[in-house]
Design a protein with these regions (language model features):
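Early extracytoplasmic/lumenal segment of secretory-pathway proteins
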Residues: 23-88
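Paired acidic/hydrophobic, glycine-rich loop segments that form the ligand-binding mouth/hinge
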Residues: 76-80, 206-207, 223-228, 243-244
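A bilobed periplasmic-binding-protein/Venus flytrap-type ligand-binding module shared by bacterial periplasmic
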Residues: 134-141, 177-178, 255-266, 274, ...
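Periplasmic-binding protein-like
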Residues: 191-200, 236-262
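Mature extracytoplasmic/periplasmic domains
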Residues: 261-320
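Conserved C-terminal helix/tail region of periplasmic/extracytoplasmic solute-binding proteins
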Residues: 317-347
Length: 347
């Protein structure tokens, strides 16, 4: 009787363990920027595959990085780092190498956005969306053709009128470009020069903001300044007078990537979800809802001719040539941060 009872217990434990493993294997855990993965996309994946998508959100690369750095066994399968953080995470062995043979939709990606310095062979990253930083003007107040360069923001008639992004790297990149330097410059003298240049922009600066810059432009609390192409693309529905300009000196291209964590607990599901996100019809849906250009050429082909001709959705090769990919500047980051603090307090 004892043996019989013992066998029942063992059988139950085996069944319970198998059930638990099955339940855990039928999910993929995603850690993504706030409002950056449409709910209907996750729902469609679950409907097609039976794999549930658990979504957690973060508001900055720093938050995501710190959480993964604190515990490599935190349970996330997929993260969405921006290009410059992807490089840092790759170098610190925080990511799983990607087997492209498991991604049948990889060939749809735009070659112009592949093989960049932050991940030379895309062994650790898949482009998700591309963000470009440029100049925003309201054509009711300012002729768009009169503001074609970053340097134009220093005009005297823009005194106390600019919206400047509350983003250290973006703002220093703007100044470095006006001086003819790389946005990833690590020369302390050049960084100081950029800081001094930005100090002269303070009289023209009305507000530093990155959180609700769309609302500020739509409500016309600022009619000229910096902005991201995707945000302005969506804002034009509420205020069609908003125009986005790709500055002549160049601009920042930030690629938000899909990456697999080093200890992804549901590796095969991660591959399935990433491949699903690269499917042209899904990539199109994401781009239209989020507002940023898709790196997926198959998705662009599915869009209307009007959207294909829209440089906010589909910047051409000539435009992209002027862009620079944001990379990690870890070795001089404290210097950038010190000058940024001084700039924000107006000294």
């Amino acid at each position: 009787m004892k043996i019989y009872f013992k066998n029942i217990i063992i059988f139950c434990l085996i069944c319970l363990g198998s059930f638990s493993a099955f339940a855990q294997s039928n999910v993929v855990n995603v850690y993504v920027w706030t409002a950056y993965l449409p709910a209907e996309v996750a729902a469609q994946f679950t409907k097609e595959t039976g794999i549930r998508v658990n979504v957690s959100e973060y508001d900055s690369n720093e938050t995501m990085y710190a959480k993964l750095k604190a515990s490599s066994d935190i349970g996330y399968d997929i993260v969405f780092p921006s290009s410059y953080f992807l490089r840092r995470m790759r170098q610190q062995n925080m990511l799983h190498a990607i087997d492209k043979d498991k991604l049948s939709n990889f060939h749809y990606l735009n070659p112009a956005l592949l093989n960049k310095d932050f991940d030379p062979k895309n062994d650790y990253s898949i482009p998700y969306l591309a963000s470009i930083t440029g100049i925003v003007v309201n054509s009711d107040y300012i002729a768009p053709k009169s503001v074609l360069k970053w340097q134009d923001l220093w005009r005297e008639d823009f005194k106390n009128g600019l919206l400047i992004l509350d983003d250290m790297r973006e703002v220093f990149s703007m100044a470095l470009l006006t001086l003819g330097y790389s946005i990833n410059d690590t020369d302390p003298k050049h960084i100081e020069e950029a800081y001094l240049k930005l100090k002269t922009l303070l009289p023209n600066t009305k507000i530093f903001n990155s959180d609700v810059e769309q609302n500020i432009y739509v409500d016309e609390d600022a009619v000229v300044g910096m902005g991201w192409n995707g945000d302005i693309n969506l804002s034009q529905a509420d205020n069609p007078k908003l125009k986005f300009i790709y500055p002549k000196e160049g601009f920042v291209i930030s690629i938000d990537c899909l990456a697999i964590t080093k200890k992804a607990p549901h590796l095969e599901n991660a591959y399935k979800f990433i491949n699903f996100l690269m499917r042209p019809d899904i990539a199109k849906k994401i781009s239209l809802e989020i507002g940023y250009p898709s790196p997926n050429l198959g998705a662009i082909k599915l869009m209307s001719k009007e959207l294909q001709a829209n440089p906010l959705f589909n910047p051409d090769a000539e435009i992209l040539k002027r862009g620079q990919i944001q990379n990690d500047v870890d070795e001089v980051l404290p210097l950038y941060e010190r000058y940024w603090e001084l700039l924000k307090i107006g000294s």
